[in-house]
């Protein structure tokens, strides 16, 4: 009986560890590029961003440092979701809000990359010809990478919720986080920045 509980507990933690690894790994390129590294810049990100990176634009550097830090926070969030000792009620709500928000935002963002890439490849949408080589990276690397991160955070949030004694408020916080992420994504899409 005890072995079954241990096995179930281990199975419940893998999504949190996957989310943590996703966040920490994804932070590496941001910090590398912020420190002036250029490997992978020209072949995997848009030409406009490449030019800003080459110029060491202060706004671009700030974005790289902030996104790198946010990815580290995502890694820490993944680890917080697998903590075996119980968190307090407020912390459980915050973890659910953040995990569902991150999960939905990442999955949506990745899905946009994939759908746009497939629409361009099908000839239904046109983009500037200089962006076509980059499109493959967004369609087949960055898009799936964001979707995988989103799925990891959502699965980690669900696994964490099963360990919380009182589900009601943390569940509501998760719904608010997920819907907030959808609303933010919709606004970004409508304004042309997402």
Kindly label every feature range from the protein language model.
Residues 16-35:
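N-terminal signal-anchor transmembrane alpha helix
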Residues 8, 12-15, 79-94, 151-171:
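Cytoplasmic membrane-interface segments at the C-terminal ends of transmembrane helices
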């Amino acid at each position: 009986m005890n072995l079954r509980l241990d096995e179930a507990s281990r199975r419940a933690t893998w999504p949190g560890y996957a989310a943590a690894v996703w966040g920490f790994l994804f932070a590496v390129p941001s910090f590398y590029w912020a420190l002036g590294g250029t490997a992978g810049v020209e072949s995997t990100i848009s030409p406009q961003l490449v030019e800003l990176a080459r110029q060491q634009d202060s706004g671009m550097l700030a974005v790289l440092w902030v996104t790198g830090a946010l990815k580290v926070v995502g890694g820490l969030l993944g680890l917080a979701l697998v903590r075996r000792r119980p968190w307090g009620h407020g912390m459980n709500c915050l973890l659910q809000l953040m995990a569902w928000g991150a999960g939905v935002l990442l999955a949506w963002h990745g899905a946009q990359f994939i759908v746009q890439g497939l629409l361009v490849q099908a000839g239904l949408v046109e983009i500037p010809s200089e962006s076509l080589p980059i499109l493959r990276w967004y369609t087949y690397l960055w898009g799936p990478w964001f979707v995988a991160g989103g799925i990891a955070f959502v699965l980690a949030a669900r696994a964490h919720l099963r360990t919380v004694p009182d589900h009601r408020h943390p569940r509501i916080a998760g719904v608010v986080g997920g819907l907030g992420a959808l609303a933010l994504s919709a606004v970004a899409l409508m304004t042309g920045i997402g």
